[in-house]
Amino acid sequence: MVYQIKDKADLNGQLTKASGKLVVLDFFATWCGPCKMISPKLAELSTQYADTVVVLKVDVDECEDIAMEYNISSMPTFVFLKNGVKVEEFAGANAQRLEDVIKANI
């Protein structure tokens, strides 16, 4: 399942609910072409790994404070968290790397 974050409190609540699972934070922008291209693959992976992965989308224009907290400078950027700790991060719409990082961390 892919869930779009509304604000910092929403993010904190979702991170608490996702305890024990791999969390993929997808920092995107509605005007970002590569973000739109990778979105279907991310949705597919979230369904494929629904028991072990939670995907949280963060619109950098709506949630600037969260983007700043994670030092996001380009989109899409994927931040991978396990039990609240960052285990990986990369920028770019690389579907194979996205799947590889998920597989390596579940």
From Swiss-Prot:
Organism domain of life: Eukaryota
Q: State what protein this is by name.
A: Thioredoxin-2
GO biological process: one example: cell redox homeostasis
Nucleus as a keyword of this entry, yes or no, is no
Keywords of this entry = Disulfide bond, Electron transport, Redox-active center, Transport
Q: Give the organism, scientific name.
A: Drosophila yakuba (Fruit fly)
As for what it does, the entry says: Participates in various redox reactions through the reversible oxidation of its active center dithiol to a disulfide and catalyzes dithiol-disulfide exchange reactions. As a reducing substrate of peroxiredoxin 1, thioredoxin 2 is preferred over thioredoxin 1.
Q: Where would you find the membrane-spanning parts of this chain? A: none
Q: Where is this site: Contributes to redox potential value?
A: 33-34
What taxonomic ancestry is recorded? Eukaryota, Metazoa, Ecdysozoa, Arthropoda, Hexapoda
Protein family (similarity comment)? Belongs to the thioredoxin family.
Q: Which gene encodes it?
A: Trx2
SS bond list? 32-35
UniProt keyword Iron present? no
